[in-house]
């Protein structure tokens, strides 16, 4: 039987913070964690962590283009969230 390695505590906390109460948003945020976060530059990781402190309606507005940001790292995170893995 294969044993799973214990999860990195920081990654576990980030995954937990990706749980928003909207399945679609959960899937997008968790997809970013699984596919992009580890390889992202520190400024992009910081932008993602900041995004997780943003209220859901504002995240949705950013994702749909109804709200724009002039933060280039946050813009890049939004772009990556909308990409298919």
Range-by-range predicted roles:
Residues 2-85:
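Positively charged, polar, low-complexity stretches
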């Amino acid at each position: 039987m294969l044993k799973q390695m214990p999860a990195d505590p920081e990654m576990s906390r980030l995954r937990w913070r990706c749980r928003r109460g909207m399945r679609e948003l959960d899937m997008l945020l968790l997809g970013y964690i699984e596919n992009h976060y580890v390889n992202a530059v520190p400024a992009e990781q910081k932008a993602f962590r900041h995004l997780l402190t943003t209220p859901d309606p504002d995240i949705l507005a950013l994702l749909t283009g109804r709200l724009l940001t002039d933060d280039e790292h946050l813009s890049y995170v939004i772009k990556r969230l909308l990409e298919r893995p």
